[in-house]
């Protein structure tokens, strides 16, 4: 989901 994209760690 989008949260995963924002936290590219």
Curated annotation (Swiss-Prot):
Asked whether the UniProt record includes Membrane among its keywords, one would answer: no
Keywords attached to this Swiss-Prot or TrEMBL record, sorted alphabetically, are: Adaptive immunity, Blood coagulation, Coiled coil, Disulfide bond, Hemostasis, Immunity, Innate immunity, Secreted
Question: Could you tell me where this protein is found in the cell?
Answer: Secreted
- GO biological process per UniProt: adaptive immune response; blood coagulation; innate immune response
Q: Does the keyword Coiled coil apply?
A: yes
GO cellular component terms, semicolon-separated: extracellular region
Summary of the function given for this chain in its UniProt record = Cleaved by the protease thrombin to yield monomers which, together with fibrinogen alpha (FGA) and fibrinogen gamma (FGG), polymerize to form an insoluble fibrin matrix. Fibrin has a major function in hemostasis as one of the primary components of blood clots. In addition, functions during the early stages of wound repair to stabilize the lesion and guide cell migration during re-epithelialization. Was originally thought to be essential for platelet aggregation, based on in vitro studies using anticoagulated blood.
Assembly behavior: Heterohexamer; disulfide linked. Contains 2 sets of 3 non-identical chains (alpha, beta and gamma). The 2 heterotrimers are in head to head conformation with the N-termini in a small central domain.
- What's said on domains? A long coiled coil structure formed by 3 polypeptide chains connects the central nodule to the C-terminal domains (distal nodules). The long C-terminal ends of the alpha chains fold back, contributing a fourth strand to the coiled coil structure.
Protein known as: Fibrinogen beta chain
The organism's taxonomy opens as: Eukaryota, Metazoa, Chordata, Craniata, Vertebrata
């Amino acid at each position: 989901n989008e949260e995963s994209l924002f936290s590219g760690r």
